[in-house]
Amino acid sequence: MNPTWWRDACQPLDTAAMDQARARQQQLTKPAGSLGQLEALAVHLAGLQGVERPNLDQVAITIFAGDHGVVEEGISAYPQAVTGQMLRNFVGGGAAISVLARQLQASLEVVDLGTIDPHLELPGVRHLRLGSGTANFARQPAMTEVQLRSALQAGRDSVLRAAQSGAQLFIGGEMGIGNTTAAAALASTLLGCPARELSGPGTGLDTAGVRHKAEVIERALVLHGLRADDPLQALGCVGGFEIAALAGAYLACAQQGIAVLVDGFICSVAALVAVRLNPQCRAWLLFAHQGAEPGHKALLDALQAEPLLALGLRLGEGSGAALAVPLLRLACVLHGQMATFAEAAVADRPV
C-alpha cells in the first residue's frame, strides 16, 4: 500500500447526476428555490452518489476512542477512567449515540485506539490499542510516527469495512477525556489563532479552568514549533489517536466515494486536517451543526462550511451528526417523491 495513501486521488463528483437533479428540482411542484438548502443538499448528494435521486438508507457510525496524556496538566473536569466507562456504555446501548443509531437504524462500530486501562477488553468493541493514551504533548510529542500512521490507517480501515457493508453515509464520532484540548491545540496551529480564542469548557471547565487550558496549549505550541503548513506534524505532536483516525476516515471516504457527515468541534478539526492533507476530499464533507465550543465557528469558516443545525451541542460522540441524518433523508425523500408539475397537472409558471 502507498505509505502516503492519504494523498491518493479522491472520487470526483458526478456532474451529470447533479445536472439531472437540478433539472428535476425545477420541475417539482413548488416555487424554484423554495426549499432552500434542502434543494442544494439533494443535488450535492446526487453528485456524491452518481444518481438523480439519492437516498441515505445505509448509514455507518464509527466511534474512535483514545485517552490523552495532556490530562496530566489538569485540563479536564473528568478523570480519564470515563473514556473506558463510556466505551462500555456505547456497546451497552445507553449512550446518546447508541440511542440515536438505533433510531436511525444505522450501524455502530466502537474502536478503542488506546485508553489508559491496558487491560480493557469489552465484547463489541474493536480493540486496536496503540498505547495507553497519547503522551503528554505539553512535554513531548503526543504520538510517535508509527502511532500516527497506525491511527490514520485505523480510520481508513473502518471506512473500508463500512464500504463493504454498502454504507452511503459515514459518521465519525470520538471519545477521549482531554480531546477538546488536543483539538484546540490543532486548531490554533492550523488556523493561526491564539489558543485562548479557541479553547472552551469541554466537559465542564470553569473560567479559570479554560484559561489554564489555553495556557497549557500556548506553551506546548512554543515547545513544538508547529507550522500551519505541516498538518501531519501538528497532528502527531498535539493531536490524539481518535482525531488522527477521524482524519484518516474522512480521507478514505472521499477516496471510496462515501459521503461524510461531520460532527462537532473535534471532528471539524479532523476534517480540517484531512482537507489540508488532500484538498480534494472537501467535496465529500457535509457539516452537521455548529456546536457550543468557541473554536467551532472559526473551523467552519475556514472550511467554508454551512452547518445544517445550531443547537448548542457539545457532547461529541457523533451525536450532532446523527441528529442531522433525518434532515438529509427528508431532503432526499422530498427530491425523489414530490410530484412534478406535469404529473400533478399544476401550472409551472405564474400568470
From Swiss-Prot:
Question: MF terms per GO, please?
Answer: nicotinate-nucleotide-dimethylbenzimidazole phosphoribosyltransferase activity
Catalysed reaction equations from the record: 5,6-dimethylbenzimidazole + nicotinate beta-D-ribonucleotide = alpha-ribazole 5'-phosphate + nicotinate + H(+)
**UniProt-listed Enzyme Commission number(s):** 2.4.2.21
Q: In which pathway does it act?
A: Nucleoside biosynthesis; alpha-ribazole biosynthesis; alpha-ribazole from 5,6-dimethylbenzimidazole: step 1/2
Top-level taxonomic group: Bacteria
Enzyme's top EC category: transferase
Q: Which residues form the active site?
A: E317 (proton acceptor)
Keywords recorded for this protein, A-Z:
Cobalamin biosynthesis, Glycosyltransferase, Transferase
Q: Name one GO biological process term.
A: cobalamin biosynthetic process
What is the role of this chain?
Catalyzes the synthesis of alpha-ribazole-5'-phosphate from nicotinate mononucleotide (NAMN) and 5,6-dimethylbenzimidazole (DMB).
Report the PANTHER family cross-referenced here. Answer: NICOTINATE-NUCLEOTIDE--DIMETHYLBENZIMIDAZOLE PHOSPHORIBOSYLTRANSFERASE
Q: Which family does it belong to?
A: Belongs to the CobT family.
- Protein name as annotated: Nicotinate-nucleotide--dimethylbenzimidazole phosphoribosyltransferase
Q: Which species does the entry assign this protein to?
A: Pseudomonas putida (strain W619)
Give the gene symbol: cobT
